Amino acid sequence: MNNLKQGKFITFEGGEGIGKSTQSQMLYEYLQSQNTPVILTREVGGTIVAEKMREILVHEELLPMSELLQAIAARYDHMARKIIPALQEGHIVICDRFIDSTACYQGLELENGIDLVYNLHKTLMPSLMPDITFFIDVEPDTAIKRVNSRNMSNKFDIRGIDFYKKIYDCFKELSNRFPERIKTIKASDLSPLEVHELIKKHL
């Protein structure tokens, strides 16, 4: 853990419809029940400014570089105003999406974009990476069925199966690239409670 931090930083990653938000909430409630100082947040968003940026990012069609820089700007505000102060106070911070989502959703749209995402992060925010990341591994065919069954949507939800497969393959690649940090939870055939129990074993 970086010397800047006293708490622990946990992130949840994966494509659309895979249960990240559910697992983030379940872990948050579990840690609260253990009287553990914990906060739950999300990206893109987490602060008033970043949530306004989120509305543009998830609903408007931006140029690829504009979209990446919007995500990075929102993250900088989120980290400075919320994540870093909470970690310095000794809290566990649970974040629904972080840098790996930026790599897959925005980085893939640019030449050498994945490396660019991590290099930008190291330049602008060198002091903070997650201590542990849970990649919720749900097959794209299953994920898109889940998304199609719900009423709410954004521009990423309504893209086709080829997009879902591309994002899935990207997260698989990142889990191989950062095996010490990213823990893969195979969840296609598991209930939310079963997934939650697997996650707890890594804490």
Swiss-Prot record:
Residues holding ATP: 14-21
GO biological process, one term: dUDP biosynthetic process
PROSITE patterns: THYMIDYLATE_KINASE
Disulfide-bonded cysteines: none
Pfam family, one: Thymidylate_kin
Secretion signal span: none
InterPro entries hit by this protein: P-loop_NTPase, Thymidylate_kin-like_dom, Thymidylate_kin_CS, Thymidylate_kinase
Enzyme class (EC, first level): transferase
Chemical reaction(s) catalysed: dTMP + ATP = dTDP + ADP
This protein's GO CC annotations: cytosol
GO terms of molecular function: ATP binding; dTMP kinase activity
Family per record: Belongs to the thymidylate kinase family.
HAMAP family according to UniProt: Thymidylate_kinase
Role of this protein: Phosphorylation of dTMP to form dTDP in both de novo and salvage pathways of dTTP synthesis.
NCBIfam families cross-referenced by the UniProt entry: DTMP_kinase (TIGR00041)
The protein's name: Thymidylate kinase
Lineage: Bacteria, Pseudomonadati, Pseudomonadota, Alphaproteobacteria, Rickettsiales
The encoding gene: tmk
